[in-house]
Amino acid sequence: EGDRGASKNWKLSIRCGGYTLKVLTENKFLPEPPSTRKKRILESHNNTLVDPCEEHKKKNPDASVKFSEFLKKRSEMWKTIFAKEKGKFEDMAKADKAHYEREMKTYIPPKGEKKKKFKDPNAPKRPPLAFFLFCSEYRPKIKGEHPGLSIDDVVKKLAGMWNNTAASDKQFYEKKAAKLKEKYKKDIAACRAKGKPNSATKRVVKAEKSKKKKE
């Protein structure tokens, strides 16, 4: 009940140029949720819409704020704004950035957040479906007959050909796909039986990826 009640206390303070999440409870200030704390602070010119939006709300309390209209005028407002006002908004952006950096220093990822699984480069690749086996056979022919055809159009033609192919002819590709699937199951089982890659293997793979990026 306590956690459920605390979740209802999240209050969103909306700035037209960006979002700042302030969480209040009766006795203490709660940290921002992980989904929002990781977001970067928007640039200073996004804050130029704070005052116009607030002013519009005060003058027209019953009317909804048309954010798109403010957004279109944002660039023009930033160019024409007085130097004093510009400095004000830049200070606001700096304060937001400083607050973000302080929060991120103490940020601890939630226990439920999963780390990216290590992908073994030597693991067997998933086998193609019958349709993709069909495509790999007929794609070169279509490209040869229609060299200027886009990728999307090539795929459309292949899909049309596959749909018009007789069921008896499709069996050839379906049987081939089934055999590849059975082989994949055996190969993946053997790979898993060997166990997860050790830390040394991970370091080698990481070093190889880093080397490729530099090249």
From Swiss-Prot:
Residues 1-31 form the SAND domain. The keyword Magnesium does not apply. The keyword DNA damage does not apply. Residues 32-108, 124-192 bind DNA. Phosphorylated. Sumoylated. Sumoylated with SUMO1. Sumoylation depends on a functional nuclear localization signal but is not necessary for nuclear import or nuclear body targeting. Sumoylation may stabilize the interaction with CBX5. It is found in: Nucleus; Nucleus, PML body; Nucleus, Nuclear body; Cytoplasm. Keywords: Coiled coil, Cytoplasm, DNA-binding, Nucleus, Phosphoprotein, Repeat, Transcription, Transcription regulation, Ubl conjugation. Gene3D superfamilies: High mobility group box domain, SAND domain-like. Its main location: nucleus. This is Nuclear autoantigen Sp-100.
